[in-house]
Amino acid sequence: MKNLNNRVLLITLFLVIAALLRLIPHPPNFVPITAIAIFSGAKFTNIKYALSIPLIIMLISDVFIGFYTISLFVYLAFIIITIYNFLRKKYTIINVFASSLLFFMISNLGVWILGGYGYTFEGLLLCYTMAIPFFVNAIAADMFYSTILFFGFKKAEKRLISVTKN
């Protein structure tokens, strides 16, 4: 039980650090939001932890960053991506790309629903088209931050296991 608690704390620490990275200046859409959802879904063994801990951390960081009209869709995407990766349970480039695509589709559908481009099929297509440059940054960020989270966690977890065994 102690090792499980240590693992939950270590995962939470990684999520807090990733959320803090949202507070530093960054290029548009180069943030660890999707990576946080991917990591928490893949690493927590309890779905309640996988959803609640990172959502609480995200809410706290959003208090400092600010909430936007699109926030509901961002959180919806976050929940869906977390569940997707909870079911997958591993880090693969395909899972990261699929998660990036899910975030892109859901968040930009939200932009369209909130009236950003007119309520027509052409407006929806324009919305997605205008978002493509941001999607490129998002994919790069998702690959970058996911890699750091997963490989950093693997090293830290090995270190934690060796420390607790001694």
What kind of feature is each model-predicted range?
Residues 1-39:
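Hydrophobic transmembrane alpha-helices
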Residues 2-5, 44-46, 85-95, 158-161:
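Membrane-interface helix-boundary motifs at transmembrane edges
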Residues 7-11, 34, 50, 70-74, ...:
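Residue-level signature of transmembrane alpha-helical entry/exit and packing/kink sites
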Residues 13-19, 56-60, 65-66, 89, ...:
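Juxtamembrane/disordered regions of integral membrane proteins
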Residues 14, 50-61, 95-103:
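Central hydrophobic cores of alpha-helical transmembrane segments
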Residues 20-31, 55-87:
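Interfacial aromatic-anchored transmembrane helix boundaries in multi-pass membrane proteins
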Residues 33-50, 80-85:
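Generic transmembrane alpha-helix motif of multi-pass integral membrane proteins
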Residues 92-166:
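Membrane-embedded alpha-helical hairpins and interfacial helices in multi-pass inner-membrane proteins
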